[in-house]
């Protein structure tokens, strides 16, 4: 059963844990005259989305908005487009081709999660081009009395964008502002998954988003934080720099990957008073390593 919670004015969410991932994923529904779905997730979540919509008495969707074209955020958009043919699917220009033809998304998902990835995520279907809308940076989508500003936010991925809800001063931030960790979600660590992570662009995006004056951060992995938004963004910037420095030094010094993992884990324990899971470590180190090699620094 879906546990829906109203987290801001007419904004509802539910969280799900996918069998193939360690982190929770958060789906957001905005109940206006026309329904809005932010972060559709993989196709495996479509039945839960439909259950949530039924509870909210939402019969249709006007907009489906994945923040970026990774399977855990956007794998279900094709299935949802079939179910709601009147909906427009908003994607970054850099992600449009992957929405219309998800061949590369399927290949990359299979490479990471194996041949049976559909057992955990469900099928990845194409979105009809007639339903795809590519918003400009800063474009405002009006839904009922609500204004949703689309802001391009690369760094985690080149096709990343966020949604700024002006009515509540909240950012649906995807992974552009890090991943909140810790008991009180006060330790935003960089979402550094390879192969496209670029910490320099990531930091530029964080600075850009800090100027929106957000009061609420609607994370896709970590739920909602309705206080200290400025402080969290500043911490995310600082942690992105510090972890990058530690990982670069450990990689530059050489040694086995186990040694690099140990150094980063020890640093994180001292700095953040918390442990990182093996998946956190692997993805974070790999994301920075791929970036440093791409830049010719390693």
What is the meaning of each model-derived region?
Residues 2-55, 60, 163-173:
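Conserved beta-strand hairpin/beta-sheet module of binuclear metal-dependent hydrolase folds
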Residues 10, 30, 39, 68, ...:
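Divalent metal-coordination and catalytic microenvironments
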Residues 6-9, 42, 99-152, 158-230:
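Metallo-beta-lactamase
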Residues 36, 65, 89, 170-172, ...:
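Residue-level marker for buried hydrophobic side chains located in beta-strands
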Residues 246-298:
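C-terminal regulatory/interaction regions
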Residues 226-243:
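Short, electropositive alpha-helical surface patch
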Residues 46-94:
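Active-site metal-binding motif and surrounding structural segment of the metallo-beta-lactamase
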């Amino acid at each position: 059963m879906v546990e829906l919670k109203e987290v801001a004015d007419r904004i509802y969410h539910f969280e799900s844990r996918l069998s193939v991932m360690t982190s929770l994923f958060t789906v957001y529904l905005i109940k206006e005259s026309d329904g809005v779905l932010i972060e559709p997730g993989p196709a495996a979540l479509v039945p839960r989305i439909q259950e949530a919509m039924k509870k909210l008495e939402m019969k249709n969707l006007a907009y489906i908005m994945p923040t970026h074209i990774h399977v855990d955020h956007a794998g279900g958009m094709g299935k949802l487009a079939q179910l709601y043919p009147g909906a427009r699917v908003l994607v970054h220009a850099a992600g449009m081709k992957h929405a219309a033809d998800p061949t590369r998304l399927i290949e990359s998902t299979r490479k990471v999660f194996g041949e049976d990835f559909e057992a955990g995520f469900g099928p990845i279907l194409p979105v009809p081009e007639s339903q795809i809308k590519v918003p400009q940076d800063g474009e405002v989508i009006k839904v009922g009395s609500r204004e949703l500003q689309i802001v391009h936010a690369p760094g985690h991925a080149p096709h990343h964008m966020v949604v700024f809800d002006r009515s509540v001063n909240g950012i649906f931030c995807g992974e552009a502002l890090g991943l909140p960790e810790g008991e009180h979600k006060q330790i935003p660590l960089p979402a550094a998954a390879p192969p496209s992570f670029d910490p320099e662009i990531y930091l530029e995006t964080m600075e850009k988003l800090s100027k929106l004056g957000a009061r609420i951060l609607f994370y896709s992995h970590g739920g909602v934080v309705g206080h200290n938004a400025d402080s969290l963004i500043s911490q995310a910037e600082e942690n992105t720099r510090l972890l990058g420095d530690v990982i670069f030094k450990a990689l530059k010094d050489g040694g086995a990957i186990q040694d690099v993992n140990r150094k980063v884990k020890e640093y994180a324990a001292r700095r953040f008073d918390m442990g990182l899971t093996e998946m956190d470590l692997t993805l974070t180190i790999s994301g920075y390593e791929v970036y440093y090699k791409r830049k010719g620094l390693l």
